[in-house]
UniProtKB/Swiss-Prot annotation:
Keywords: Cytoplasm, Queuosine biosynthesis, S-adenosyl-L-methionine, Transferase. InterPro entries: QueA (IPR003699), QueA_dom1 (IPR042118), QueA_dom2 (IPR042119), QueA_sf (IPR036100). PANTHER family: S-ADENOSYLMETHIONINE:TRNA RIBOSYLTRANSFERASE-ISOMERASE. Pathway: tRNA modification; tRNA-queuosine biosynthesis. Monomer. One of its GO terms (molecular function) is S-adenosylmethionine:tRNA ribosyltransferase-isomerase activity. Transfers and isomerizes the ribose moiety from AdoMet to the 7-aminomethyl group of 7-deazaguanine (preQ1-tRNA) to give epoxyqueuosine (oQ-tRNA). It comes from Shewanella baltica (strain OS155 / ATCC BAA-1091). It is an enzyme of class 2 (transferase). This is S-adenosylmethionine:tRNA ribosyltransferase-isomerase. It comes from the Bacteria. Its EC number is 2.4.99.17. The gene is queA. It catalyses: 7-aminomethyl-7-carbaguanosine(34) in tRNA + S-adenosyl-L-methionine = epoxyqueuosine(34) in tRNA + adenine + L-methionine + 2 H(+). It is found in: Cytoplasm.
Amino acid sequence: MRVADFSFDLPDELIARYPMAQRNASRLLTLDGNSGALGDKQFTDLLGMINPGDLMVFNNTRVIPARMFGQKASGGKLEILVERMLDDKRILAHVRSSKSPKVDSFILLDGGYQMKMVARHDTLFELELLSELTILEVLEAVGHMPLPPYIDRPDEDADKERYQTVYNQNPGAVAAPTAGLHFDDAMLDALKAKDVNIAFVTLHVGAGTFQPVRVDTILEHKMHSEWANVPQDVVDLIAQTKAAGKRVVAVGTTSVRSLESAARASQGELKAFSGDTDIFIYPGYQFQVVDAMVTNFHLPESTLIMLVSAFAGFDHVMAAYQHAIAQKYRFFSYGDAMFVTKKAH
C-alpha cells in the first residue's frame, strides 16, 4: 500500500488546540470492525460498551517536561526536545538551532544548567548534564510540556495537568498516550464497580511518534523504537480474560503496540516483555492480543492511522474519518475519541 492512501483533508478548525473543560466531556465515535457500522456517542457512553470481565489495558507512562531552551557557547539560541532518557545524566535529544552543536561543545540551559554534547547518532544528539541534579530534576525545574507541533501554541500551566493521564506513574514519555486523557478517576471507579478488570503497561512515547512518514510505500518505512514493559501480572490477566471468553480492550495505540510487541517477542504463548520495540502495525497484520481499542483521531499518513486501519479494516477506518470530519469531531491529541472493535480475519 502507498502512504498516500492514508491521506485525508482536515479543516484546520477541527484540530483541537485545547482540551475540553472536563476530561470525559469528549465525543466518541464507535466503529464496528466487522460491519463498518458507526455510532455517534459521548465518551461516557463507553461505560455501557465494556462488559463485566473484560480487561482494559492502559499505558501508565508519565510525560516529562521534555522541551528545554538554552544557548550554545557562541551565544546562538537552541531548543532541545528529549527523545529518551539514557540514564540520570544523559539524554538522546532533537536539537533545533541555526547550526548543529559540535561534539564536546557546551550548552547553557535556561536556569543556568550546563550540558555537554557527547556524540551524534544520526539525527539525534547525546547530551550529558553537568550537575549534581538528575535530568528529571532539571526538566521539572526548567522544562516545558512538549505539546505536539499541530497544537501550534506555547505550553501553558494547565497543560502540566491536562497533557497527562490521571493514572500516570512512570516518567519517560515525551508525548502523551492521548486516548487515556479522556478518563478521570470517577470513570475508572465506575469501570471497576462494573467488574471490568484494569491493568497497566508502560510504553514511553517518543517524539518520533510525530515524525512524518517520508517514503512512498509502507514497506519502506523504518519505525522509530520506544521502550515498553508488559509485566507478568498483565500477561496472567490476559490469559484469564481470554479463557473466560472476554475481551482485551487496549486504551490507546501505545497499549496496543506494547501488547502486540510482547506477543511478537514470545512467538506464540504470551510472555512478559521489557525492552525496546519498533513494531510497525499496518493492514495485513494479524492481531494476537487486542480485541477492541479506544483511540483518538490521528494525523493523515501517520503510522497510527495505519495501525487502526489494520485493526478495523482500511475502508471502514477511512470512511469513519470522513464521517468524523463531516460531523465536526475534534482531532488529534486534545480531540475526541473512537471505540473500535476488531475486524475478523
